């Protein structure tokens, strides 16, 4: 008796709702929830000695119990090389937020003293350790700071409560892997929203939440 062998057919993987409010991945009719970015506790993503203290399901970062006069740096669990990405931050105090290649030294003393990253705080931006934007609108405790980053061309936009406040066209490479980053100081905190439960403000057209469903990854 002869037997016929047929190649196994696999269902196609399709995206569902993968815009700014990315929700699910469909695989053969089965919905798979994507993983959204959080704040990383990995050694490679946090400053040695002065490591940020994470809470709120790893979405809020603060300093250690006895921080002294020291900045505490960290990055997110997920990052990207290219694409258009959006996330939100609610600050208390004058902590710093930004984005940097993961090749950057996370153990540096000052967050804004980087050789390749973007850092912002209260109306200014520094790129590669140099001040490139200053004197713009300050943010206040409890504001929603929207960050839109075009990893294809290096342009970063900062929104305060839904209104564009300032931006900068950097020359950050679109061939290096990068992650959102931050630094907190004594008494200051940052709470991040990566879109898992939706954003407080509407992302700019074409910008997506940082999730595996949208193509973000750990490395």
Which residue stretches match the model-derived regions?
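PRY/SPRY (B30.2) beta-sandwich protein-interaction domains
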Residues: 2-219
